[in-house]
Amino acid sequence: MEIVYHICCGIDVHARFLVACLLGDGKQVTRRFSTMTCDLVKLREWLTDNGCEYVAIESTGVYWKPVFNILEGDLKVILVNPEHARALRGRKTDRLDSIRLAELLSVGLLEGSFIPPPHIRRLRELTRYRESLVRTHTAAVNRIQKVIESANIKLAQVASDVMGISGRRMLSALAAGVTDPASMAQLALGKLKHKQAELQQALDGALDTSHRFVLGELLRRVRELEAAQEKVNAQINRAISDPDHPQLLKAWELIQTIPGVGHIVAEVVIAEIGVNLRESFPTAGHLASWSGICPGNKRSGGKRFSGKTRRGNRYFRTILVQAAWAATHTKQTYLSAMYRRLVRRMGKKKALVAAAHTLAVMIYHIIDRSKPYLELGADYFDRTQPEKQLRYHVKRLQAMGFKVTLEKAIEMA
C-alpha cells in the first residue's frame, strides 16, 4: 500500500508505562517509557528530534489523556478507537500493538476520534462531573424513599415532593428522634399544611435507631451534593462566559432559542461538540452519526438488515433525547407536530429518537450559521404536504367503513 506518512509513531498506552514504535526511512525503533510527566516529555523530545509529526494512540480508558495533553502542542495526535485497530488472531504483545498502530497509521488506515480543543475539554470535565453528581443525588433520594418506606412512613402518599421544603423538615425531625406524628405534621408549609390528618397517619411509622441514623446520613449527603452542584454550576457559568472565547456564550444563547431547550442542555451540547463544528463534522449528518442518533446502515447482497442505531457519545445522545422529550411536548411547535405525526406509525420510543435526530440537525445549523432557531409552526406539514394529509384522512375514513367522495368546494367570487 502507498505510504501516506513517511515518519510516524504508534503508541500502546497502559496505566504505568507505554510502548512507542517509530517508523521512518525504512527503520523501526521501539522504546518503552513510563507514564510520569518527565518521561512523557522525553517521549515528545524523542519524537520531534526524529522528525515525527503524526502519532496514533489507542483510547484506553483515561490513560491516553496525559499522553495526549503532552504531545498535542507539537505533534498531530490521532486518537484511535481500539475496535478500529484490532489485530487478527495470533500473538499479542505491547510491542506488536505499537508496531501495528504505526503501520496502519503510515498507510492512512486509521480514523481519528473527535477531540475538542483544550477550553472545550475543560468545560466537558465540569459538565460530566455535574452529571455524576446528579446521578449520585438521585440515588441518595431514592435510598431515602426506601428507608422511610421500610419503616412504614407513607409521606410520599401525601406529599407530592418528599424532598421539598416541607418534606425535608419532617424527614429531619424523624432523623432527630421526634416520634409524635402531630408535632411533625405541624412542620408542613403551603398547601400541605391543610392535610394535617393525612400527614399524621402517614408519619405514624416504626423507625428504629438504624433507620434514624441512615436517614440522617442520607439527608446530610443530599445537602452536600446540592452544595457541590451549586459550585460546579458557578464554574460552568464562568467557563461559558470566558471573555477569551466569546463564541461559547453566543452559541449557548442561540441553542436556547429552540423550544424546550434550557441552559443545562445548551451547556452539555457545547461541552460535548464544541462550537467549531465544520472542523470535525462536515455536515449535520456526520454529527448525527457520531452521536449515535441515526439509523444504522447494514446492507449485504442487496438486502437491508437491522436499522438499529449505532453506538455514539452517550453524554450527547442522552441530553439530545432528554431535550427532544421536552421539545416534543411543547405546544404549537414544529417539533411537537413532527413527534405526533411519527408516533402513529413507529411508536413513542422510535419517534423520540427521530425527534432527537432532528434536534441534532437543528443544533448543528444554529451553531454553524450563528442564527437563532426559526419556528416553522405546528401546521408546517399541513401547509407543505396537503395531498399527503388528504390521503391520510381518506384512508382513515375508509378504514372506518365510509365511502369517501371528494369534491372541491366552489370558491366564491
Which residues are covered by each model-predicted region?
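A detector of single, family-specific signature residues
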Residues: 1-413
